[in-house]
């Protein structure tokens, strides 16, 4: 039976591998994983620019992932499995190559971080061709929800635009509101991914969305990043099943 699974595919590499094996035995795509940024219109435009080659090869990427608050019980590992997992998948998709090593670094803690939680954290990841990716991850940013990305290429850069909000000028001030959460930032992405999944099941859309192998790869990369939270060093990704 076809299944749409919210990310992550599973919480352990072994469970992800078992899902991949079951799907392979069935001989067809059964699982789509909810990596919805692949369906966001802005990300798709960036993907098209990269694929065109007009800016040359990508060299580096700088990202921010800021959430104003998080529920009790949030752990350091969840910074990777619940937050960074999106950047892990989006760059596998955008660059068309694997992330092969990474490191997590802790900064000075915000006063809003719960006991035992390092926040913010900085993720460094390298692809097979040595594209360097840095991601600032914060789940206690206080001021609002913000996702940012700039990709540095040989002939120029590509920056993810901020959500369009009315700019108000009044009483000696000018400014705009900042959104509060992911649901306000990615409504089209969620609609598009579910419609794509339905269309694929009905035979209207020939190309499958992110599947069990993508979920497995993301889990392998996440494991390396979580290991780095403890070791403090660069960790290689192990893709062995």
Where are the model-predicted features located?
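Rossmann-like NAD(P)H-binding beta-loop-alpha module
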Residues: 41-63
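A general structural signal for well-ordered alpha-helical segments in protein cores
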Residues: 16, 43, 87-91, 191-197, ...
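Structural detector of well-ordered beta-strand residues that form the stable sheet scaffold
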Residues: 4, 30-32, 62, 134, ...
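NAD(P)-dinucleotide binding in Rossmann-like oxidoreductases
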Residues: 113-116, 128-195
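C-terminal helix-rich "cap/oligomerization" subdomain common to oxidoreductases
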Residues: 17, 24, 199-241
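Rossmann-like dinucleotide-binding domain that binds NAD(P)(H)
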Residues: 70-132, 138-143, 213
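Short glycine/serine/threonine-enriched helix-capping/active-site loop
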Residues: 32-35, 61-64, 104, 237
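Beta-strand-loop-alpha-helix segment that lines the small-molecule cofactor/substrate pocket
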Residues: 1-38, 53
């Amino acid at each position: 039976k076809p299944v749409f699974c919210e990310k992550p595919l599973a919480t352990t590499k072994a469970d992800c591998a078992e899902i991949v094996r079951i799907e392979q035995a069935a001989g067809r795509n059964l699982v789509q994983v909810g990596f919805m940024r692949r369906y966001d219109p802005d990300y798709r435009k960036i993907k098209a620019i990269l694929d065109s080659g007009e800016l040359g090869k990508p060299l580096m990427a700088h990202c921010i992932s800021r959430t104003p608050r998080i529920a009790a019980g949030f752990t350091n590992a969840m910074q990777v499995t619940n937050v960074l997992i999106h950047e892990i998948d989006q760059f596998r998709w955008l660059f068309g190559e694997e992330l092969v090593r990474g490191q997590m670094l802790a900064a000075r803690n915000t006063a809003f971080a719960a006991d035992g939680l390092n926040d913010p954290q900085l993720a460094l990841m390298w692809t097979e061709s040595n594209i360097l990716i840095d991601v600032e991850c914060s789940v206690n940013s206080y001021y609002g929800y913000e996702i940012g990305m700039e990709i540095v290429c040989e002939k120029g850069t590509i920056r993810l635009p901020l959500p369009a909000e009315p700019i108000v000028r009044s009483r000696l001030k000018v400014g705009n509101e900042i959104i509060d959460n992911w649901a306000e930032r990615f409504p089209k992405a969620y609609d598009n991914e579910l419609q794509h999944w339905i269309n694929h099941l009905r035979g209207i859309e020939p190309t499958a969305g992110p599947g069990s192998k993508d979920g497995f790869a993301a889990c392998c990369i996440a494991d390396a990043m979580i290991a780095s939270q403890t070791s403090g060093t660069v960790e290689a990704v192990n893709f062995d099943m």
